[in-house]
């Protein structure tokens, strides 16, 4: 068992080399830049939304991002250490009291808004 954990830690170091993964939690707004490969073409596509869940499972860690597009809620699950993710940016931090925000699926408009963590200039 210890050998498997050691191997996973080595793989995580390889996959995060040259990448900075911010420390984000459910309720935070993030922008995930994905590499999309279509035939011979490769491009970067941004996906911005609220993190509604995070699963910390070593190399299999994942997180779910929800956004509203054209009035329709869209959720996408990302593997944290995927080589297809070029970068993750933390846009703003939210204040929530739950680890899983699945209840946001049933809310619309202002009710689905998450309070934002305010930083004073002294604390920055």
From Swiss-Prot:
GO terms for biological process: translation. GO terms for cellular component: cytosolic large ribosomal subunit. PANTHER family: LARGE RIBOSOMAL SUBUNIT PROTEIN BL19M (PTHR15680:SF9), RIBOSOMAL PROTEIN L19 (PTHR15680). This is Large ribosomal subunit protein bL19. One of its GO terms (molecular function) is structural constituent of ribosome. Keywords: Ribonucleoprotein, Ribosomal protein. The lineage of its organism: Bacteria, Pseudomonadati, Pseudomonadota, Alphaproteobacteria, Rickettsiales. Coiled coil: none annotated. HAMAP family: Ribosomal_bL19 (MF_00402).
């Amino acid at each position: 068992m210890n050998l498997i954990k050691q191997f996973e830690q080595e793989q995580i170091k390889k996959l995060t080399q040259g990448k900075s993964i911010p420390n984000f939690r459910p309720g935070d707004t993030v922008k995930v830049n994905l590499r999309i490969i279509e035939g011979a073409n490769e491009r970067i596509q941004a996906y911005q939304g609220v993190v509604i869940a995070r699963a910390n499972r070593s190399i299999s860690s994942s997180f779910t991002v929800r956004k509203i597009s054209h009035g329709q809620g869209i959720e996408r699950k990302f593997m944290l250490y995927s080589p297809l993710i070029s970068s993750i940016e933390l846009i703003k931090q939210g204040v929530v009291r739950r680890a899983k925000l699945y209840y946001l699926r049933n809310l619309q408009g202002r009710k689905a808004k998450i309070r934002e963590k305010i930083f004073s200039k002294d604390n920055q």
